Amino acid sequence: MKNEIAAVVFFFTRLVRKHDKLKKEAVERFAEKLTLILQEKYKNHWYPEKPSKGQAYRCIRVNKFQRVDPDVLKACENSCILYSDLGLPKELTLWVDPCEVCCRYGEKNNAFIVASFENKDENKDEISRKVTRALDKVTSDYHSGSSSSDEETSKEMEVKPSSVTAAASPVYQISELIFPPLPMWHPLPRKKPGMYRGNGHQNHYPPPVPFGYPNQGRKNKPYRPIPVTWVPPPGMHCDRNHWINPHMLAPH
């Protein structure tokens, strides 16, 4: 377990020194605190006979869902440095298993072996050389700190001018944007002689004019109320001031 943790610590210190934000003393202090934290975490979750057991628990991971690894953050707090000064990639995964440490930059990239151990008694210099060789084999794209999510976002933001023109709203004519006026209300004509046929069925009125189209026939006259003259019933007559009923004048 010591060799694997040493490989992880060398891996982080190499990245931090490349970022060149911290002094040598701060980097060494961070490496010491991280070593103690990982040793305490892994001591009861280390299974040499079955290396894959507890792999998720020992994994160190940073991605868009987990921006900061809690163990690395704790090492920063214990060494009085800022997490942002480490300069770690936005997507980084380290699998710390018995006899092997693997790494992956970005969620969609292939993993590579940081260090593998056949001999438990390897010294720190040999471990450091293994980690250095592994990092040197990684391309510069891995070290740029770009993530797969950033690449997807940048691709989405790139819009061709032709696509903007094609997606623009079509030019509408003014007549298409103005709704036709509501038709005026006209009363139905009164019934006239001859509106009913001999079979008892009423003739149909002309079909209504579709909404929005002018009437092609004769113009309808505006509605005018018909004056009503009241005619007194038979037997009643009036004088100048009031109506007189002749039955009321009969002797009792």
Curated annotation (Swiss-Prot):
The record's comment on protein family reads: Belongs to the BTG family.
Alphabetized SMART domains for the sequence: btg1 (SM00099)
**What is any one GO biological process for this UniProt entry?**
negative regulation of cell population proliferation
Tissues showing expression: Ubiquitous. High expression in the ventricular zone of the developing central nervous system. High in ovary, testis, prostate, thymus and lung.
- Origin organism is Homo sapiens
Top-level taxonomic group: Eukaryota
PANTHER family linked: B-CELL TRANSLOCATION GENE, PROTEIN BTG3
Q: What is this protein called?
A: Protein BTG3
